[in-house]
Amino acid sequence: MSNKKADSKPQSRYPVNLLDTPFPMRGDLPKREPQWVKEWQERKVYETIRAASKGRKKFILHDGPPYANGDIHLGHAVNKILKDMIVKARNLAGFDAVYVPGWDCHGMPIEIQIEKQFGKSLPAAEVMQKARAYATEQIEKQKVGFRRLGVLGDWDNPYKTMNFTNEAGEIRALAKIMEKGYVFRGLKPVNWCFDCGSALAEAEVEYKDKTDPTIDVLFSFAEPEKTAQAFGLSALPREEGGIVIWTTTPWTIPANQALNLHPEIVYALVDTPRGLLILAEERVEACLKLYGLEGTIVATAPGAKLVNVRFNHPLASAHPGYKRTAPVFLGDYVTTETGTGIVHSSPAYGVEDFVSCKAHGMADSDIINPVMGDGRYIESLALFGGLSIWAANPQIVEALQGAGSLMRTEKYTHSYMHCWRHKTPIIYRATSQWFAGMDVKPNDTDKTLRETALEGIENTAFYPAWGKQRLFSMIANRPDWTLSRQRQWGVPMAFFVHKETGELHPRTLELLEEVAQRVEKAGIEAWQTLDPRELLGDDANMYEKNRDTLDVWFDSGTTHWHVLRGSHKDELQFPADLYLEGSDQHRGWFHSSLLTASMLDGRPPYNALLTHGFTVDGEGRKMSKSLGNGIDPHEVANRLGAEIIRLWIASTDYSGELAISEEILKRVTEGYRRIRNTLRFLLANLSDFDFAQHARPVEDWLEIDRYAVALSTNLQNDILSHYDKYEFHPVVAKLQTFCSEDLGGFYLDVLKDRLYTTAADSVARRSAQTALYHIAHGLLRLMAPFLSFTAEEAWKIFQPNSETIFTETYHAFPAVPDAGALLDKWTLLRAARSDVTKALEEARVANLIGSSLQAEVEIRASGARYDALTSLGDDLKFVLITSAATVVKVDSEAEEAVEVIASKYLKCERCWHYRADVGANAEHPTLCDRCFSNLFGNGEIRSAA
C-alpha cells in the first residue's frame, strides 16, 4: 500500500499516526455489489482466473443443471453459492477449479408453459421452436440472478441440454448403452400422470395425503371342491361365501385378475351369517368386528395349499363382462398388518401384482388394462366405460353393494403418490416402454447394472457421510429405469420399429449415429422432419419412427458424457471431482448420473457427492406460499446485500436444514459488520506502509507480532483443513472469533498505542505493520470464497495493482522460529490479561477508575504465569492497557490475585497514559517523556509489545 495518508485532517500540536482508508465503515452492499458484478463482467475476471490457473491440477465441480423455468428462489441461491464457495476455495488452494454452469431445458414444465400460452393444438415444429425460445429467455433471466449473488463462472458459455451438440451426445449415449445390452422394451406398470399423459421418473413423484374409499370385497367360491381340499375338508359346510380382500383403490377392481396369499401365513375358513369367509387367521377377530359379524373357524390352511384355487369376480353377477375367475397366486409381499391378509391383484396397476402374475405364467397379451392415458376407462368397459377412475370409485362401491360383494367401506386417509408438477394423484399403469434393466448383465461385464452402481457407491466419498447409505438403499431396491416418455419437447429415442413385429431395425446402432449427426447440425427438430426413406431406403415401408422421447433425467444424467467429455471437454474432465446438490437428488441427478455412468463407464461420474439440506423458516417450517414465510433472495440482496445471503449460507451447517428469518439475517448482518470493521482497521493502519520499503524481517519483530503471525498461521491451517472437507460453518465461526477476540479483543487493542504513538518509521511501528500486512493478506484470502464482494473491495485498496483477489493463492505466512513456545506463552498471558480486565471492570464499576489507562495494577502470580508476565518487562503495561504494571511472585495459584489502584500521576495529552514524567520537559508540559522521545528524539524502544 502507498505511504500516503488517505485524508488530510487538522494537525494537532502533538500528532499521532491516526490514518484513514477509502474502505468505508458502511458496506452499502446493495449499491456497491452490482457495480462489482458489472466490473467483473467487463474486465472478464473469470477468464483472468482461468489464465492465471492454467497448468495447475484441475478440480472439477460439475454443475447439476437447474430447470430453465421461473425465477431463482432461495434454494437456488443456497446451491449456487455453495458451489461458488468451493470453486473459489479450490482456486485459492492452487487448483485450476473450473465452473461451467448448466441448464436442464427439455421436458414437461416448459411444454406446459407453451400449452398455457399457445394452446394444445400447435404443430410439433412450433412447439419445439417456442420451447427453445422460452428456455433461452428463462436461462438469461436466471443467469442475471446468479451473477448478482457473486457467483463467478463461464456464464457466457454455459452448457444447455438443448444445445445441438448435447442433444446429439444424448443420442450417442443411448446408442452406447443399447450396444452393451442394457436397453429392452416391455410392458410394465410405471408411474403415470394423467395430466402429463406420460410416464414419470421416481424422482418426479412426491407423496401427499389423499382420502379414498377403502373396501372389503368378497370373491365368491368358483371351485368349492378344490377349496374344501385345500382346507383338508371333504366338502364345504355351505356354498355361500368366498375369500375377502381389502383395497384402497376400488377403481382397480374392474381389472382384477388374481388373488395373492402369502405361502406361509395361516388362513382360516370362518363360518359367519354372511357365509364362509376366508381370512388370514391373525385378522379374523379384527375383521369380523369391523363387519359386525360373529363366526366360528371351521378349518385352517397355509396359503401354499390354496395356490391356483379360483374365485369369482365380485361383479360377475352385476354384468356379463365380469364373468371370469381369479386364481390364487402366492406372494411374499403379502402381510397381515392391515386388511384381511389377502391382496387382490390387477397386474396392470401394481408392480408387485404384475411381477406375481408374470411369475405365474400370465402373458402380456392376457393382462387387462382398461385405463387410458388420460385417466378414463375405455368406452367398452362394462358398467364404467368412459368414466374417470376417480369419478368411478363411488359407482364401483355401489355396484359391489348391489352385487352382494361389499363387506364394508369407509373413508381412509393415506400417503399417496402425486405428480411433482401438477400436484395431482398418479397411478401405476402398465404400458409398453423402453427400460434400462437394473439386473441385466451387459455383454462387456459379468456384473449387472445394480451391482456396478452399488460397487461405485462404495468407492465414492460422501459429504455428509449418511448420504452413502441413502443412495445405496435406493439403488439396491429400485425397479428398472423407464427411459421412455410420451412427450414432444425432448430428445427422441430415435429408433425405427417394424410395423408388424415391433422389432428394432437391424442397423439401429448405425442409424442412431446417422440421426445424431443430423441432430448435431439442426437439433432434435431434425428427427421430427426426417423422412425414413432418407436413411432406410426400400425398408422405409416396413418401419415407423418411434415417437417416444428420453426421460429428462437421462438428459441431465448423461451430462458427464455430453458435457464433461463433449461440449466442454476442453475445460472439464471425467470423472468430476464433485457433484453438489440438495438432498432430493439422491433419487434425482446423483441417481441418474450414477446409473448412466455405470452403464457407459463401469464407474460413477464423480469422486465425491455433497448434499445440502433445504431452507426452512426460523421455526423450522418448510417455506410455502400458504404460510407466507418464503424469503426472496433478490429482495434480500437489494435490501441487505447478497453478501449477507452468502455469509448466512457459509455460517449455517448445510448438512441439515438451513433456517432463515429476519432475526437470523439481523444476526448475520451484525457479524458481517464486525468483520468489516476489522478489515477497516487493518487497511487504515497499513495506508502508509509499503512492503518493499518498510517491511521488517521476522528477527526484528516484537514478540507479540511474532505471536500474532504464528496464531494467524495456525488459524489458516485449521481453516484450510475445513475447506478441504467442504465445511464452511466452522470457517466462519473461527474467522469471526479471530476477528472479534484474537484481533479486536486483544492484538489490535494492544497494538493501538504502538501504531498511533511511536515514531512513524520506527522499528516498533513497522514491526506491527509488517505483522498486520501478513494478517490482512491471510484474512482477505480466507474470507474471499464466501465474502467475495467485500474481499475484492478491500483487496483493490490493499493491493491496487492486482487485477483481482481471485487469481491469488492462500497466503504464505513467514515462518516464526519460536512459534510453538510463543503460542504456549501467550495463551498464559492472555489468561492473565483476562483476570486483569475483570479486575479493571470491577474497579470501574466501583468508580475507582474511568478508563483502564487511569489504572496501575499489581499482579500476584506463581509458576509459569509469573515467568511469562515478568518476561515482558516494562512492555507488560501495554499488553494490559494500563499506565503501570508490576508483578509479585507468590508460591501457589491460590495466592494469585490482581490489585488495581488509580494512578496519582498526570495524563499525557498525546498517549493518554498517566505517568510521573508528564511535564518533565518545560517546553512541553502536557507530554510524557515517551511521547517527547517519539516526536522529537530517537524514539522509545519496545521489545515485546
UniProtKB/Swiss-Prot annotation:
Needed co-factor(s): Zn(2+)
Residues where Zn(2+) binds: 908, 911, 928, 931
Cellular localisation: Cytoplasm
UniProt keyword annotations, A-Z: Aminoacyl-tRNA synthetase, ATP-binding, Cytoplasm, Ligase, Metal-binding, Nucleotide-binding, Protein biosynthesis, Zinc
EC number(s) given by UniProt: 6.1.1.5
Binding site for L-isoleucyl-5'-AMP: 581
Source organism, top-level taxon: Bacteria
UniProt motif 'HIGH' region: location: 66-76
Gene Ontology terms for molecular function: aminoacyl-tRNA deacylase activity; ATP binding; isoleucine-tRNA ligase activity; tRNA binding; zinc ion binding
Residues annotated as binding ATP: 625
Gene Ontology biological process terms in this record: isoleucyl-tRNA aminoacylation
Motif ('KMSKS' region): 622-626
This protein's GO CC annotations: cytosol
Top EC category: ligase
Reactions listed under catalytic activity: tRNA(Ile) + L-isoleucine + ATP = L-isoleucyl-tRNA(Ile) + AMP + diphosphate
Pfam families hit by this protein: Anticodon_1, tRNA-synt_1, zf-FPG_IleRS
NCBIfam families, sorted: ileS (TIGR00392)
Domain notes: IleRS has two distinct active sites: one for aminoacylation and one for editing. The misactivated valine is translocated from the active site to the editing site, which sterically excludes the correctly activated isoleucine. The single editing site contains two valyl binding pockets, one specific for each substrate (Val-AMP or Val-tRNA(Ile)).
Function: Catalyzes the attachment of isoleucine to tRNA(Ile). As IleRS can inadvertently accommodate and process structurally similar amino acids such as valine, to avoid such errors it has two additional distinct tRNA(Ile)-dependent editing activities. One activity is designated as 'pretransfer' editing and involves the hydrolysis of activated Val-AMP. The other activity is designated 'posttransfer' editing and involves deacylation of mischarged Val-tRNA(Ile).
Binding partners and assembly: Monomer.
Assigned protein family: Belongs to the class-I aminoacyl-tRNA synthetase family. IleS type 1 subfamily.
UniProt name for this protein: Isoleucine--tRNA ligase
Species assigned in the record: Paraburkholderia phytofirmans (strain DSM 17436 / LMG 22146 / PsJN)
